[in-house]
Amino acid sequence: MNVVELLGLPALEEHLQRLEPLLVESVVTGDGFLDEVTTHLLAAGGKRLRPVLALATATSGSGAATREDLLGAVAVELVHLASLYHDDVMDEATVRRNVESVNARFGNLVAIVAGDFLLARSAEIAAGLGTEIAALLAATLGELCQGQVAEVHSAFQVGRSQDSYTDAIAGKTASLMATSCRIGALTGGLRRDEVDAFTLFGRYFGMVFQVRDDILDVVGTEAELGKPAGQDLAEGIYTLPVLLALADPDAGPELGPLLGQPLGQPERDKARSIVAESGAIGGATTVARHYAELAASAAVSGPSADLARAFTRLAHALVDDLPAD
């Protein structure tokens, strides 16, 4: 999915071209080894989704990105990158963005400290943008950690509730999407009601994004995902499709005995097959579509009709290609 093309906002491409050197500049120290570690995933690319949200929101009224707008986008992307460094250590992942993960290449200790370094740089940038943005980013880091801890705490719990799942993804994913939009709205000088509206869009968009990701973890391939498929199942992270399958009177009795323990590849494949063939995928898609509609409703409250249409397209694009059943 090419996010910039989908949004149909021509100036965004130029903004992102200006963003890339700032991202590199923000993490380069002059220490050759540390620079190699901190730029590893930057060099691998990525959708830059959170900076896109920040920049699209910031420029919704003027169309021109200021240095403050760009630095706000850098700050949220560094938080996202740091979370990937830490997540891959926790998951013992070996692949990220179709390249070696940082922990696989440099070791867990280096990956953890490098992730901390990225967070420190993000905080430093946010401090330069004012106390409101600095406090917002700090609060978001707390939400990210709370969501991640909630997910880890529920690992291998076959009786995990859907509310537990919703709370976890609201923290670990939706919070940073919301903050990306809010920081963009703040650096862009939008009215307070517009700031709040775009923040709400970002939160609902983040919920759609994570539910979609969890569906694709079941039905997607490693080539499509850029990481091994079924990784959450193997690690005991039971996401919405799995929880819905467990509640299904036909799939649940077959799936339940497989879970509650680490899964080898054969068991992982069998569990994915059970979930995919149940009605759980359609049920999860319905939830994703609900969040997409909420996101679209929030977007129309902004100052730009073009951006409202663009954000609505983006939210709908996340669900348009999901399987209905």
Per-region residue spans from a language model:
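All-alpha prenyltransferase/terpene-synthase fold signal
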Residues: 1-325
